[in-house]
């Protein structure tokens, strides 16, 4: 029983440590990184530069997977692009 509790505790800790987010990466002014069909290689490179696991061009902007919590992503409700 103690072993089972320890296993569950470890799994919960791993989930907290490896938690990541997905979303559109943004430029310093708050706008999404623009892309065109066929530029998924560029988006993937940009996402990995920001410590994400991968990314692709979800036209018209780069979508990233596995971003760390400190990386800002586009938020529709707090959009600062062009303001």
Curated annotation (Swiss-Prot):
Subcellular location, record wording: Secreted
Main location: secreted
Disulfide bonds: 31-81, 35-57, 43-62, 47-64
Signal peptide residues on this chain, from the entry's feature table: 1-20
Domain notes: Has the structural arrangement of an alpha-helix connected to antiparallel beta-sheets by disulfide bonds (CS-alpha/beta).
Biological process (GO), any one: defense response to bacterium
CDD domains cross-referenced by the UniProt entry: neurotoxins_LC_scorpion
SUPFAM superfamilies named among the record's database cross-references: Scorpion toxin-like
Protein's name according to its UniProt entry: Ardiscretin
SMART domains, per database record: Knot1
Keyword Disulfide bond applies: yes
Keywords tagged on the record: Amidation, Antibiotic, Antimicrobial, Disulfide bond, Ion channel impairing toxin, Neurotoxin, Secreted, Signal, Toxin, Voltage-gated sodium channel impairing toxin
Native species: Tityus discrepans (Venezuelan scorpion)
GO molecular function: sodium channel inhibitor activity; toxin activity
A GO cellular component annotation in the UniProt record: extracellular region
Protein function: Inhibits the sodium (Nav) currents in an apparent irreversible manner. Produces small depolarization and induces repetitive firing in squid axons. Is specific for arthropods (crickets, triatomides, crabs and squids), but is non-toxic to mice. Shows antibacterial activity against both Gram-positive and Gram-negative bacteria.
Entry-linked Pfam families: Toxin_3 (PF00537)
Protein family according to the UniProt entry: Belongs to the long (4 C-C) scorpion toxin superfamily. Sodium channel inhibitor family. Beta subfamily.
Domain LCN-type CS-alpha/beta: 21-82
Keyword Signal: yes
């Amino acid at each position: 029983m103690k072993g089972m509790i320890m296993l569950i505790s470890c799994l919960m800790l791993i989930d907290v440590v490896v938690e990541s987010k997905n979303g559109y990466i943004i430029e310093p002014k708050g706008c999404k990184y623009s892309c065109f069909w066929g530029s998924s290689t560029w988006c993937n490179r940009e996402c990995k530069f920001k410590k994400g696991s991968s990314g692709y061009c979800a036209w018209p902007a780069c979508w990233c997977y596995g971003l760390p919590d400190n990386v800002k992503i586009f938020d529709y409700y707090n959009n600062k692009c062009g303001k």
